Amino acid sequence: MPTLQQLVRKGRIQKHTKTKTPALNNSPQKRGICIRSYTITPKKPNSALRKVARVRLTSKLEITAYIPGIGHNIQEHSVLLIRGGRVKDLPGVRYQIIRGTRDVSGVTARRQSHSKYGTKKVKN
């Protein structure tokens, strides 16, 4: 244990935490262009065809981003907005595409959690 005088002289070393979304570079979102839209299969206990897109960000980095919701209109050269947030059963997918922004349409006929999928509230 250091003495008070040693702490005055040197101080304590700050622990550096590793970021979970390095491509965002401390931004809440980043814009990117879709390079390829495809499906991948999840890890062991789960079985599905999850929709993902390979995206080139404005910072020239290439990432894999998950496309949430049912159905999408993302094609090559679509402009996308990316946020952080991993998909637990897809290794290497640490980003998600924000629906209802730029060239990406919202999920059609979505009633619950509609704000997360870029859909307007249905008036009864």
Curated annotation (Swiss-Prot):
Annotated disulfide bonds: none
Top-rank taxon: Eukaryota
Pfam family, one: Ribosom_S12_S23
Annotated InterPro entries: NA-bd_OB-fold, Ribosomal_uS12, Ribosomal_uS12_bac
UniProt KW keywords: Plastid, Ribonucleoprotein, Ribosomal protein, RNA-binding, rRNA-binding
One of the protein's GO biological processes: translation
Coiled-coil segments: none
Keyword GTP-binding appears in the UniProt entry: no
SUPFAM superfamilies named among the record's database cross-references: Nucleic acid-binding proteins (SSF50249)
Subunit structure: Part of the 30S ribosomal subunit.
Gene (name only): rps12
One GO MF term: rRNA binding
Signal peptide per UniProt: none
Primary role: With S4 and S5 plays an important role in translational accuracy. Located at the interface of the 30S and 50S subunits.
Protein name: Small ribosomal subunit protein uS12c
Source organism: Helicosporidium sp. subsp. Simulium jonesii
Main localisation: plastid
Record's keyword annotation contains Oxidoreductase: no
Localization, UniProt: Plastid
Record-linked PANTHER family: 30S RIBOSOMAL PROTEIN S12 FAMILY MEMBER (PTHR11652)
Family note: Belongs to the universal ribosomal protein uS12 family.
Record GO cellular component, one term: plastid
